[in-house]
Amino acid sequence: NKLIFKSKKFSKYNINKYKLYENDNIILGDDGGNLFIFSINEKRIIRKYNFYKNKFKKIKKKINFLVANNIIFVSDNLGYLYAINYKKDKVIWAKNYKIPFRSNLKLYQNKLIATNQNNDLFFFNKTNGDLIKKIPTEETLVKNEFINNLSISKNNLFFLNTYGSLYSININVM
């Protein structure tokens, strides 16, 4: 085992446990809301992006992100949902839905799928962030640290919520 490369520290904040890979780039996020695009070929950070204004600077961000075709889709615990073209360093769209998102993100055809802390399941238009459909499920009375989980298999979307219920939805009818 030979060390090929070691970078300097990316951030003063904790790095998100999820790392994504696309086109020889590693995409990381941190608790400060920063997104880092690290080029494996160039062995350096080629982009650093922070969507948040100074008024959110002291708030710890829990960001969930997904990448497809040079677009990073992001949801957070502040209620924001946004899409960034990381190659062009440009925000495509951004929306504030005013309730914290609390799940991984999924893409299916032209839909971006997420859930919030109230166990509501959302389908958004991935090109503009507009809400297509909202499906409420049971709400938990006690807030916990469980993160809702989304998974897609064939034509089914599986949704495990914080209440502990598992839903299976035919995604083609959404």
Where in this protein do the model-derived segments appear?
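Blade-level signature of beta-propeller repeat domains, shared across WD40, Kelch, NHL, RCC1
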Residues: 153, 157-158, 163-173
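Extracytoplasmic beta-rich repeat domains
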Residues: 2-23, 44-69, 90-109, 131-154
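Structural signature of WD-repeat beta-propellers
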Residues: 30-31, 69, 76-77, 116-117, ...
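Short loop/turn segments that connect beta-strands within beta-propeller blades
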Residues: 1-2, 39-43, 85-89, 125-129, ...
